[in-house]
Each structure stands twice: as C-alpha cells, then as structure tokens.
UniProtKB/Swiss-Prot annotation:
UniProt binding sites for Mg(2+) 1: E409, E416
Protein name, per record: Lysine--tRNA ligase
Note describing how the cofactor binds: Binds 3 Mg(2+) ions per subunit.
Keyword Manganese included in the entry's annotation: no
Organism: Streptococcus mutans serotype c (strain ATCC 700610 / UA159)
InterPro entries attached to this UniProt entry: Aa-tRNA-synt_II, aa-tRNA-synth_II, aa-tRNA-synth_II/BPL/LPL, Lys-tRNA-ligase_II, Lys-tRNA-ligase_II_N, Lys-tRNA-synth_II_C, NA-bd_OB-fold, NA-bd_OB_tRNA
Keyword annotations: Aminoacyl-tRNA synthetase, ATP-binding, Cytoplasm, Ligase, Magnesium, Metal-binding, Nucleotide-binding, Protein biosynthesis
Length: 496
C-alpha cells in the first residue's frame, strides 16, 4: 500500500527536495554514480586497531570509504560526522581549509540519511576515535525522507517488520542476525556439497499437495486451465530423483503452508530436505547432527550455545530415545503393551488427553500422548525415534515391531527442528498409506493429503533403500541467534 500520493510533504521533505534541485543546478547528480572505495569501516578499524594518534600521523596513510551519513555536527569551518556501511560506522573529520570551499558546501548541505564518499587521511582524534580527515567529499545519493525520529534503535515492531530496511539501518544487531542467517545457510550447503550431495531444484507449483501434513495454498494456471497448489514439501520430487539414480540430493528453498501464524510459524518458510541412497534413519541421525553442529560452529564457535538463558550442549553427541520409552518415563503409561483402541482411548481419558475424530488407532493416541506430555520436557538436543505408522505415512515400518516406523524427530528446547526416516520404498505399502490419508481427510483431518499416483508409479520402477531428512532453517536460525520469534529471522515476514 503506498501512502505517497495522498501525503503532504512536510517541511523537512520540502527542504530536502530543494537541496536536491540545488545539487542538479551545480551539475551534481543527486542520485550519484559508481564510486570506488578502497576500504570498509571494519577493515580500517581492524588494520589500525593498535596504532596510536602519533603513529597514524607518521604513517600518513589514506583511504576512500562510502556510506550513509548517520550523525553530523560542527560549526563554521570544521565538522564531524559518522558514515555507516555494512560493517559499522566510522567518523569523518572535515575542515573547510583542507577540502576547499565548494567541497565543504557539499558536506555542509548533506542531510542525515544521504550517502557520501569520503577520501582522506587516517587519523585518531584526541578522544582516541579512529577517523578519516577528509581531503575530498563526493555526494552519492540524496535521501528525500528523514529517518524516523528514533532511528537509533528503532523499537516499533510494526515498522521493523513492514519496513525492514529502516530496522537494518538503525539496529546493528538486526543486521548482524541476518548476516548470521546467510552464514548458516552457506555452511549447510558447504557441508553437504563436501559429502557429495547435489543441490537440485524441484517445482514450486504442484498438481497434488504431498510430502507433509499441511493445508496448501491453491492457485490456478490460466493457459492450462488447471488448479495447482504451492508446495508444502519437496519430498516426493526429491525421492523421484533417488529413483532416477542421483543417489545424494538436497534442496533448500521456500515451502508454503496455508495455516496459522505464531512465534515459530510463517506461511512461507525455508526448509532443507536431504535424501541419501543406501542409508537408513540412523545414518541420517549422524548426518543431521553434522548439519546442526557445523552450522552452530560456523556462527558460534565449537562450544555449547545459550538460548534464552539455557545452556544447550549442541557440541556434544545428541541423545537418542524411543518415543514409547519417553512417554513411559514421563507419564508411567506403557504403550509397548499390545492394546485395543478402546483401551488406549480409556488411558487418554484418564490422563485428560483430548481425542480427535480422526484418531482411529492406538498409534494416533501414542502420538497425542507424546505431544501432550513429552515435548515440553525435551530441552537438550534429542533424537526421538520410532513414531507410530499411522502418523508417518512416508516412513518405513520397523522390522522388529511394525506398529512403529524407522523415523525420528530432532527436538531442542521443546521444539521440533527436523524430521527424518528410512524412506518407504515399497509402492504397494505406499499406496495403502496414501489411501489411509485420503480416508482421514474425509473424516475431517484437513492436514491429510490426497493420493499421488504418479509418485507410486515412480516407486514401482524401484527405489534403493534410502534415508531422508527435513530441517526447518528458520527455526535453526532462531536457535543459533537466540531469537524468540520467527519474524526476527525472516527479512520480510508475512504481515496482514
């Protein structure tokens, strides 16, 4: 929504436009052109960190920097200012008798928010601040709007999320958090590429939602006159590539789920899915641990991390436990015993576990017990494995106890960070499970998906035993940046 057309220009905006016109009259483009820097603020601070005022005077080195004008003060023929680039701020010191009259006017007329290029000598002030004594100033771009009043530490969350650029200008820790996000993503790619995985791209527009339990966004392809959905997962396409012989593949990208928003859910989010032929879920536990630990080390070093005041031993081997053992530990209820649905329902009522209409088997109730009692107790990294077959439609059954699957979820600080399993590669079993999902959908489970016959056909050509994994990147970034809401790790979160 643009408010520009109805908004009256305020005094500041009028003055800035007049200054823009004055620059044009002087033959200076108010919006500048290419500019060659020799250094950034961070490079200069690092290079000259241990040099005294006198040493800098003797070395007499020069540099050219560029950035946004953030502070400005001075009287008459001398001025001080701070320029901000991606790495931080550096002070500039401007004297009329050094830069000359015309050049000094450019500095004098510059507004907070404008971009300037500054060439000059590296020095330290009497206060000990590393600065550049300008020999020449170049106007690079005019800001026609002043930054918001409280731009040193913008706190209005509406503005932070709607106008992220203002947040990045004014909140250093916010910019750092997004730089960290980029580093985490690069490190995960680097780690997987090093293990021989291929990064692939599969369609965002699907004919049938599949690969996860979620409500899709629907759209329409006009030329083909067909309804389509935005992907809720990349799973079924990636497994087709395993059928095709690609052996080790991953895809990192946006997933779309037409569901509620809260501190850990945004309708579009980033996930990575990884598939490895000839592996099982235990191999994938090792791989998952490797991905998470490499990402953590890249941005936090190789010790434990702190999340909201709790120390997380992310650098140590992750605990591994069966879902049924954990339920027994927390509630005393033992689901290893064979039992009827009625017996399980009675246990649920006894423990006040809410029952849904589509809970048609013991497996559904086991899962409900886990969500109700166990999740909130899981603080340190743990692989919870052995989920019931009814809630794991794409995972292989456990050979020793077919009520359960060779599946795990990674939990840290009560939240799920990853979901993985030995993939179901039996097309007959897969079709049965798709049919069970379709039946659950009929009973009102709006997260259940339909039947993907094309995928079943792919499996009929033969898929090697395979292990697969999905990790929510946004949640991982939240964990590694000690952030409590997903909106703080998405540059442009969905807003009403």
């Amino acid at each position: 929504m643009s408010h520009q057309h109805t908004e009256e220009l305020n005094d500041q905006q009028i003055v800035r436009r007049e200054k823009m016109e004055a620059l044009t009259e002087q033959g200076i483009d108010p919006f500048g052109k290419r500019f060659e820097r020799t250094a950034t603020s961070g490079q200069l601070k690092e290079k000259y960190a241990d040099k005294t005022k006198e040493e800098l005077h003797d070395i007499n080195e020069t540099a050219t920097i560029a950035g946004r004008l953030m502070t400005k003060r001075g009287k008459g023929k001398v001025g001080f200012a701070h320029l901000q680039d991606r790495e931080g701020q550096i002070q500039i010191y401007v004297r009329k008798d050094t830069v000359g009259d015309d050049n000094y006017q450019i500095f004098k007329k510059a507004d907070i928010g404008d971009f300037l290029g500054v060439e000059g000598e590296i020095m330290r002030t009497d206060m000990g601040e590393l600065s550049i004594k300008a020999t020449h100033i170049t106007h690079l771009s005019k800001a026609l709007r002043p930054l918001p009043e409280k731009f040193h530490g913008l706190t209005d969350v509406e503005t932070i999320y709607r106008k992220r650029y203002l947040d990045l200008i004014s909140n250093r820790e916010s910019l750092e958090r997004f730089i960290t996000r980029s580093k985490i993503i690069s490190e995960i790619r680097r780690y997987l590429d090093g293990l021989g995985f291929l990064e692939v791209e599969t369609p965002v527009l699907h004919n049938e939602a599949g690969g996860a339990a979620a409500k899709p966004f629907t759209t329409h392809h006009n030329a083909q006159d067909m309804d389509m959905v935005l992907r809720i997962a990349t799973e079924l396409h990636l497994k087709r590539l395993i059928v095709g012989g690609m052996e080790r593949v991953y895809e990192m990208g946006r997933i779309f789920r037409n569901e509620g928003m809260d501190a850990t859910h945004n309708p579009e989010f980033t996930s990575i899915e990884v598939y490895q032929a000839y592996a099982d879920f235990e191999d994938i536990m090792d791989l998952t641990e490797g991905i998470v630990q490499h990402a953590a080390t890249a941005v936090k070093g190789d010790g434990p991390i702190t999340y909201q005041g709790t120390e997380i031993k992310i650098n140590e081997p992750f605990k591994r436990a069966h879902i049924v053992d954990l339920i027994k530990e927390v509630t005393g209820v033992d689901f290893w015993k064979e039992m009827t649905l009625a017996e399980a329902q009675a246990l649920a009522q006894e423990k006040n576990v809410p029952l849904e209409k589509h809970y048609t088997s013991v497996g559904h109730i086991i899962n409900a017990f886990f969500e109700e009692f166990v999740e909130e107790t899981l603080i340190q990294p743990i692989f919870v494995y052995g989920h019931p077959v009814e809630v794991s439609p794409l995972a292989k059954k456990n050979a020793d106890d077919p009520r359960f699957t060779d599946r795990f979820e990674l939990f840290i600080m009560t939240k799920e960070y990853g979901n993985a399993f030995t993939e179901l590669n039996d097309p007959i079993d897969q079709l049965e499970r798709f049919k069970a999902q379709a039946a659950a959908k009929e009973l009102g489970d709006d997260e259940a998906t339909g039947i993907d016959y094309d995928y079943v056909e792919a499996l009929e050509y033969g898929m090697p035993p395979t292990g697969g994994l999905g990790i929510g990147i946004d949640r991982l970034v939240m964990l590694l940046t000690d952030t409590t809401t997903i909106r703080d790790v998405l540059l442009f979160p969905t807003m009403k």
